[in-house]
Amino acid sequence: MSEFQLVTRFEPAGDQPEAIRQLVEGIDAGLAHQTLLGVTGSGKTFSIANVISQVKRPTLVLAPNKTLAAQLYGEFKAFFPNNAVEYFVSYYDYYQPEAYVPSSDTFIEKDASINDHIEQMRLSATKALLERKDAIIVTTVSCIYGLGSPETYLRMVMHIDRGDKLDQRALLRRLADLQYTRNDMDFARATFRVRGDVIDIYPAESDLEAIRVELFDDEVESLSAFDPLTGEVIRKLPRFTFYPKSHYVTPRETLIEAMEGIKVELQERLEYLRTQNKLVEAQRLEQRTRFDLEMMLELGYCNGIENYSRYLSGRPSGAPPPTLFDYLPADALLVIDESHVSVPQVGAMYKGDRSRKETLVEYGFRLPSALDNRPMRFDEWEAISPQTIFVSATPGNYEAEHAGRVVEQVVRPTGLVDPQIEIRPALTQVDDLLSEIHKRTALEERVLVTTLTKRMSEDLTDYLSDHGVRVRYLHSDIDTVERVEIIRDLRLGTFDVLVGINLLREGLDMPEVSLVAILDADKEGFLRSDRSLIQTIGRAARNLNGRAILYADRITGSMERAIGETERRRDKQLAFNHEHGITPKGVFKDVADIMEGATVPGSRSKKRKGMAKAAEENARYENELRSPSEINKRIRQLEEKMYQLARDLEFEAAAQMRDEIGKLRERLLAV
């Protein structure tokens, strides 16, 4: 299937039809770069969905962080339910790269926790690009990091057709080559089980289906997809393609060839270190590298095999690493969301990675070829990028220099105008803010507050909380999943005010927010630049009563430019509304729609329903508790369960238990 089927009950309106027409025209004309300058709430994602639907090209959508990537994934999934919308972000829940600190002679081993579900989604994303023309991949800057080369990856693929002549032992050996493991007890992703002539295989990239291969003697009699949970056969298949468990899986002959190259480099490096009288470094390098070589010979891989990626992919020294961009077809389209943030990120990745690895090489922890296991440099990324659309309300300098065409989308179909901006003195900002919060919460509206420092955010949160405000604080120490949950809770009304520093800006879709308060707006710098101010003010642009208050004792150049641009957009929207007789309407979005896919994109709906049912039963049980002794008993039971869940690494369920215990303790105080 190469047709993109856009499913929506809306028609393009306002500036959207013209923006879509110009972008499609630019793509067809072969423009390398275009910019969609779209204000908050103007439906930029909807316009891009229409462009993708019309040009019918595989598309990579690059977001600046996982939170926005999750939001975009959910939106594109809703727009294209019949197409391959995939999610490709870093699969690390926790990542500590290996590093050496010479000043204290401290070596830090690589330590990482891989999210199994996101690993599955990454494999699913590359499979979609290799097999389908109707793929939309939502990604972050992790797409410029090294990945196994597509040529090597495709050589490992295994095709099975119904009617094929296939020896069972040969099939099991091929599965082992793909790094699948046999497990007849616990049937999980990238495993297989054997029962007589029936082999069940759980594909590495699949979340919901496993494949059953039934043999009759040495012939494939039947191929079918089945539900691994219930065993129910979903459909019969004429053919199926199995992909490796990892992007780094390598054919045996390539591995042997790579090992020879590694041995040659090792000898050269050892000679160099010894001539420099670096005997400790030489001994360390030889020991570590020979251990890796032995692991590769015996198992086909080793820990940190990505450090030998130059040899595994057969690329010369200094060549760019294979990345997700190498999996894109020639006619692909690149959409960079919030490009004023995303583009600088691409350039920043290489330098930080390089300095750490140079230290490892210098002190004998890695061969010099490890330097080629790196993210792409900015110039390499520019060279490999397909036709690009930059999407931003505040395009940066790079977009201005490279925009073949700038398409404005300033008018909102809903008629909503940009928030009114008010400047108030900074001297009384906290007390004034408190009175404004009370006005908004009385109307069941939400408030965002941005400060300059972490300390000020914490102090302000404590102050507001002491004055009876339901407030939370969003900061960089909170992980991606919890950040999404906090934003969701704000929208649901669990609390009314969210305080932050630099996290309440690009792309966050919160129609319930009617007031944005910017403290110390006159302190020039990155957090109070004109782009930052426009983005922050824009968080209130989806609400009919949207307003922004800038607390400042003087008007800076950045404030002047931000206010001027916001007023220009207001005037254009008001003129459009007057001309077409439009009465502004607020935006109403189901919370689940926006956050679909954010926590664990594509996770089983059955699991969600099961958790919801358990929560309902818990709530019913808690309501039946009356006396303090009953509540105390229940708390002890839940604590035991919570600790057991934590020991089993079921942290999400343990957190739910912790919340239940907190509620019960509050009830205990009230009894």
From Swiss-Prot:
Amino-acid positions noted as binding ATP in the UniProt annotation, renumbered to this chain: 38-45
Sample GO molecular function, one term: DNA binding
Key word Nuclease present: no
Region (Disordered): 600-624
Motif window: Beta-hairpin: 91-114
Residue span, UVR domain: 632-667
InterPro entries: Helicase/UvrB_N, Helicase_ATP-bd, Helicase_C-like, P-loop_NTPase, UVR_dom, UVR_dom_sf, UvrB, UvrB_inter
PROSITE patterns registered for this protein in UniProt: HELICASE_ATP_BIND_1, HELICASE_CTER, UVR
Keywords for the protein's UniProt record, in alphabetical order: ATP-binding, Cytoplasm, DNA damage, DNA excision, DNA repair, Excision nuclease, Nucleotide-binding, SOS response
Gene3D superfamilies according to UniProt: 6.10.140.240, P-loop containing nucleotide triphosphate hydrolases, UVR domain
Keyword DNA repair: yes
Functional note: The UvrABC repair system catalyzes the recognition and processing of DNA lesions. A damage recognition complex composed of 2 UvrA and 2 UvrB subunits scans DNA for abnormalities. Upon binding of the UvrA(2)B(2) complex to a putative damaged site, the DNA wraps around one UvrB monomer. DNA wrap is dependent on ATP binding by UvrB and probably causes local melting of the DNA helix, facilitating insertion of UvrB beta-hairpin between the DNA strands. Then UvrB probes one DNA strand for the presence of a lesion.
Protein name: UvrABC system protein B
Gene: uvrB
